[in-house]
UniProtKB/Swiss-Prot annotation:
Keywords tagged on the record: Ribonucleoprotein, Ribosomal protein, RNA-binding, rRNA-binding
Identification of the protein by name: Small ribosomal subunit protein uS14
Protein origin, superkingdom: Bacteria
Family membership noted in the UniProt record: Belongs to the universal ribosomal protein uS14 family.
Signal peptide: none
Gene Ontology biological process terms, A to Z: translation
Subunit structure: Part of the 30S ribosomal subunit. Contacts proteins S3 and S10.
Residues forming coiled coils: none
GO cellular component terms listed in the entry, alphabetical order: cytoplasm; small ribosomal subunit
Organism annotation: Vibrio cholerae serotype O1 (strain ATCC 39315 / El Tor Inaba N16961)
Pfam families: Ribosomal_S14
Amino acid sequence: MAKQSMKAREEKRAKLVAQFAEKRATLKAIISDVNASEEDRWNAVLKLQSLPRDSSRSRQRNRCNQTGRPHGFLRKFGLSRIKVREACMKGEIPGLRKASW
């Protein structure tokens, strides 16, 4: 199990990403715009750098909903591979069963 503080940190990051997503997108559009002046582009870079570090989407980490485990995360289920296997063996996931060939 992951520490509660790690889970809380990820939730905080998710809120920051949602809060600043539009602002980051507009600043990145200005930076990549070829027709914008150099001064406007430079000001956009400075404003982007002044935003909170955790507001970047790449800082987020997918975590298992039950355990908070950061590795082996399966997006389709929102669980780690270990919890998916346990649920599968108990028959809690419809249509999913152990492979055999």
